[in-house]
């Protein structure tokens, strides 16, 4: 998959998980954050997004929330960080 095909690559994990390593170029929008839907509302609802977490569960939940909010672009569940890294060919980096 070409990472350039997505408006954003979104990591929906906790801040601690993000700090332990995330995809280069990803943005963090933690699904457990109180302002998660407010963060999503800042995005282009017609664009394509690649979403990942630790196992794919929270990414799936985030995709459902995005669909309920009216997102119409392609929403891809990348599963885990390692799987997403492999699929997109992006390194895992730390802050």
Ranges and model annotations:
Residues 3-7, 15-48, 57-95:
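Rhodanese-like catalytic fold shared by cysteine-dependent sulfurtransferases
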Residues 52:
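Short, surface-exposed ligand- or partner-binding patches at beta-edge/loop junctions that are enriched
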């Amino acid at each position: 998959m070409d990472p350039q095909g997505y408006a954003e690559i979104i990591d929906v994990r906790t801040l601690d998980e993000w700090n332990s390593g995330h995809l280069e170029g990803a943005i963090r929008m933690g699904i457990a954050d109180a302002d998660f839907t407010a963060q999503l509302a800042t995005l282009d609802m017609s664009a394509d997004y690649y979403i990942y977490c630790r196992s794919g569960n929270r990414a799936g939940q985030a995709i459902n929330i995005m669909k309920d909010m009216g997102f119409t672009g392609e929403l891809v569940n990348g599963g885990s960080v390692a799987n997403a890294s492999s699929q997109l060919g992006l390194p895992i980096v730390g802050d």
